[in-house]
Amino acid sequence: MRAVDGHRYWGWPMWPEELREPTHAGVQAFEQAHAGLVEFHAWLQWLADEQLGEAQALGRELGLPIGLYGDYAVGVNPSGSETWSDQALYRKGAGVGAPPDALALKGQDWGIPPQDPHALIAASYRPFSNLVAANMRHFGALRLDHVMALFRQWWVPVGLGSIAGGYVHYPLDDLMSVLVLESERHG
């Protein structure tokens, strides 16, 4: 929508109702009506992926033993493609942040939607595995931003501030196993 109507629609929560659900017939109709634009943006994604792969290969050819070093973010944009395409995985009504401490007396709310650990388990960790694999694709090393998020995350109720938040625990052993598996797959 953004590419079609300029900045009128900043993310899927602001799209017309029939486009907010990926399986709605309106999405297929939009794809057909704007096939050239959809293909152009898919091509841009492909091109960026190709260039990242070439940069990794060049780094290795030039003697960098690891090549590119990537960064796996703690979360995703609440109006981005991840939350649109897998809405059941992300909890509405909460954000990820940090509890009150000496550096931030009221805590922090990063505005990042948390993944529901129960939904992650129900999906056999495929969303996490796929995201890790995609992030490892062109990197020789991958830094996990806030690695503690594999163990627990501070969830902040929307509109109530971080002080009203609490820790939600995640299945650390299972998530670490996925990381080990994907690390082995990617060398």
Each predicted region: which residue ranges?
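Conserved, well-ordered alpha-helix/loop/beta-strand core segments that scaffold catalytic motifs
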Residues: 41-73
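Alpha-amylase-like alpha-glycosidases and glucanotransferases acting on alpha-linked glucans and related
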Residues: 1-49, 75-187
